[in-house]
Amino acid sequence: MLTLARQQQRQNIRWLLCLSVLMLLALLLSLCAGEQWISLGDWFTPRGELFVWQIRLPRTLAVLLVGAALAISGAVMQALFENPLAEPGLLGVSNGAGVGLIAAVLLGQGQLPNWALGLCAIAGALIITLILLRFARRHLSTSRLLLAGVALGIICSALMTWAIYFSTSVDLRQLMYWMMGGFGGVDWRQSWLMLALIPVLLWICCQSRPMNMLALGEISARQLGLPLWFWRNVLVAATGWMVGVSVALAGAIGFIGLVIPHILRLCGLTDHRVLLPGCALAGASALLLADIVARLALAAAELLIGVVTATLGAPVFIWLLLKARR
């Protein structure tokens, strides 16, 4: 038994090391790649200081943190809702953050500071997550909870579309395009949003014990002495915060929170002590690679990263849905 446990521990460490190396390589590639390839030796030249340190580095850090946040949010929601298909984008949480953001632009007439817009996005994500948690407490089946989340997402999307058509604000129309997901406008002015993600990410990665209990189911978690009400509300707040900040940074990006936790579980990372940091590393790597594809796929324009993640993630989601039905 001890031998098996040690083998599993070594395997987990190997996986985390491999994911760390992958993330580091993706980060370096993201800083080098672009319309102009800038090698490591040119990073401290005048050209490198402009392209690498002023343009690419803030974008790369934002992509890294948002990818980690979305993947961890997916893992937390799957444990929280006891549902393998739970994910911020599919369950409408990202669209809820978008509604909060657009409401702030409309009501504030474009005069609100960036921090207020970020807080409104977080509030929108929290409201949708709380509604979903109420549905989950009624012990809906996987398909019903998924449909409820999709319905909430459609309602939020419709509200955003109505706001766009009845608004004369150019900022709001640009915001709708940005809500499709993209890091094109990220620079050092958004560094406060990046910093807002770091403490919550680190805190959740340290909460493996309650997460493991929640993954066992509500009855087992109660029997093990876990205060369910407290942990549900804290994790809902943390997830809403991460999704809201991510939407404020880059718009709605789907499928990262669904696909990454599933792939890692298929690789044997089921213990949340390893799954949570693994999700952070894998989510950051996957979104960095998707961002590189979005930047380089077209010569004269930049693809929206939400299009890239949806193209890659939708087939995996269909496969997972068919697998869940079996």
From Swiss-Prot:
The keyword Cell membrane applies. It is found in: Cell inner membrane. It comes from the Bacteria. It holds the Pfam family FecCD. It is a multi-pass membrane protein. Its main location: membrane. Keywords: Cell inner membrane, Cell membrane, Membrane, Transmembrane, Transmembrane helix, Transport. One of its GO terms (biological process) is cobalamin transport. The chain crosses the membrane at residues 15-35, 61-81, 88-108, 112-132, 146-166, 184-204, 240-260, 274-294, 302-322. One of its GO terms (cellular component) is plasma membrane. GO terms for molecular function: vitamin transmembrane transporter activity. PANTHER family: FERRIC ENTEROBACTIN TRANSPORT SYSTEM PERMEASE PROTEIN, VITAMIN B12 IMPORT SYSTEM PERMEASE PROTEIN BTUC. NCBIfam families: PRK03784.1 (NF003001). Part of the ABC transporter complex BtuCDF involved in vitamin B12 import. Involved in the translocation of the substrate across the membrane. HAMAP family: BtuC. Belongs to the binding-protein-dependent transport system permease family. FecCD subfamily. The complex is composed of two ATP-binding proteins (BtuD), two transmembrane proteins (BtuC) and a solute-binding protein (BtuF). This is Vitamin B12 import system permease protein BtuC. The lineage of its organism: Bacteria, Pseudomonadati, Pseudomonadota, Gammaproteobacteria, Enterobacterales.
